[in-house]
Amino acid sequence: MFERNQKTIFVLDHTRYFSIASEEYISMDFLKGKPSGDGGATGAAGNATGSGGSQFSKSLWTCACESSIEYCRVVWDLFPGKKHVRFIVSDTAAHIVNTWSPSTQNMSHVMNAMVMVGVPSRNLPTSSDYSVIHGLRAAIEALAEPTDEQLAAMADLGTDELSRIPNKGRVICITSARDNTSMKSLEDIFNTVLVQQNTLAAPPAKKGLIIDHCHLVILNIVPLGVESLVTNRSLLKISPLLDVEIHTVSAPDISYKLTHLILNHYDLASTTVTNIPMKEEQNANSSANYDVEILHSRRAHSITCGPDFSLPTSIKQGATYETVTLKWCTPRGCGSADLQPCLGQFLVTPVDVTSRPSSCLINFLLNGRSVLLEMPRKTGSKATSHMLSARGGEIFVHSLCITRSCMDEAPSITDGPGGRVSDYRTAELGQLIKMSRMVPLKVKDPSAPPLTRRLPRYFPLTTSSSILFHLQRHISWLSHFLHLLVKEDMDKQDEVRCQQHIHELYKSASRGDVLPFTHTNGARLKLSKAKDQYRLLYRELEQLIQLNATTMHHKNLLESLQSLRAAYGDAPLKSEPGASLLRSFTESPLSPERLEPISSVGASGSSNSNSLLKASKRRMSSCGQRSLLDIISSAERSQSNKRLDFSGRLCTPLGQVAKLYPDFGTKDKDAVTTGASITPNVKEESVRS
């Protein structure tokens, strides 16, 4: 309830330095005649009025005062009566401009008080009594004072539980320091006073509320074109009670800096409404397009956008923050069926409330009109994402639903991502749900199967993805056969029936009978295609039995099926038991079969040739089921088997590292040794001679 932005205090430096000009000169417009001086020239600080009075410059105090008042105007427009802002002016002492009372939390009170304070005089004496520290001390004391909401919470909880009331705040100090050392001393003084204030607020004194945390923002402003020795610093944790950040900014840009800061302080977003048609002030017969920047809650954008939409952003000249660009949509009459559902409404306020485009847009909305705003999609088309309207003298932005809403008709289950799917096993799924229904028991049955066993392990969602469940519509006994396979309490009679059905399948395969698929249209298939169909049928049948093999009867069925496949010439792969179970979960029944590894070590030449011939025939028969990667990989393996392996692997014992280039340098050593052995003989012969 009491967030850190609940309390914000501005401390304005009212010392002599803030009476100097900001060095940004503003040209004066004349209704008649031409200005005598150059309006774009920039003069000295002392010549603020320019040549002939055609230009003037604001003081540092005026820039700081205007920007801080605009800050609180935005806060009070978007959070009326919920967020509180106070002002403290500091020179020889701290001057309180307003309090936490709702009667002083308004623009009229603050502006009248600022007029009475006035611009600091240049004739003030240079003294250490003029300091911003007085205002910082008063700001900490103001944070300890409760607001009306905190007073109501104190009345509900009682005086003994004041520590349970959150009390956080933010202090924005606008001053000017010489260097980083001065800033460091300012931070240390603020932290010390903060700790002292919490000591006074603790029992038994109980002078105010304990400050849980404070965020200090120091804005060091300088005239335009003047370099400062104070460096910028991002948010830094000074102590558990204090976080400090420092920004050095020129006086004309302080309004942009505060607008950037307020976006993060109150979780706001900036939106620029572009292409607003407006009559020209000079020529009423023509019109031009203008842009107006507004501020609102960030949720106005976050709840609207879906994955198919992007927010077009841009950075305005002179600013450092991004603004979302939305285009003015010409108002048109539309019925209730053409309106999109509204996801939320949020208060808005213009950034520059005194500009002519902003005032025209505000008056247009306050007169009862509504404005639709468009945003471009990624595909290039446009969508109406927001709407501006006014009610009760307040302007709201409405976030419209640009994706599928809950009020739209739900999409059909047959409209899948790959096209229209019409063969879902809906009736079988309903029967499976009824069969899998569980009821609680008062006493746990130790003989009951575990919960994981009760869950179905294999259930194709569509008929086209399964051969077994596709054929049960055309083979009368297949439905009963599949029901027996998944029974948890299979007995000997059920096993015998299943054995008979499996033998019938193999008899029909040996006779060359074609499986009654609906897509064959009664045409006679080739022998190889018929064998492929039976092979896939046996594979899916084996997978189904393997997943339900919980009794000895299921295991007997599995062994008989595997033996029949071996007799038929379609034996399953011999691999680890865990690997076959993993493949049964991960592979589809229609996936291509794996190739058997060729193990010919220690066999005779004739047996090797026969096994290679069988393997090649098997590969040729199953090449239609293999992918391109399998074909290329097998070709690379066959080529690599023809080449000799690296001699380092062949000659090096197991566990040792092979030496690279073992004969490198041996020839040079032999030459040196031979030369050394020949030289003494030559010397001996010369001596003898």
Curated annotation (Swiss-Prot):
Keywords in alphabetical order: Cell cycle, Cell division, Coiled coil, Cytoplasm, Developmental protein, Differentiation, Meiosis, Mitosis, Nucleus, Phosphoprotein, Spermatogenesis
Superkingdom: Eukaryota
Post-translational modification: Phosphorylated.
Predominant place of localization: nucleus
Signal peptide: none
Region described as Disordered: spans on this chain: 591-619, 665-689
Cellular localization per UniProt: Nucleus; Cytoplasm; Cytoplasm, Perinuclear region
Main function: Component of the integrator complex, a multiprotein complex that terminates RNA polymerase II (Pol II) transcription in the promoter-proximal region of genes. The integrator complex provides a quality checkpoint during transcription elongation by driving premature transcription termination of transcripts that are unfavorably configured for transcriptional elongation: the complex terminates transcription by (1) catalyzing dephosphorylation of the C-terminal domain (CTD) of Pol II subunit Polr2A/Rbp1 and Spt5, and (2) degrading the exiting nascent RNA transcript via endonuclease activity.
Designated name of the protein: Protein asunder
Native species: Drosophila sechellia (Fruit fly)
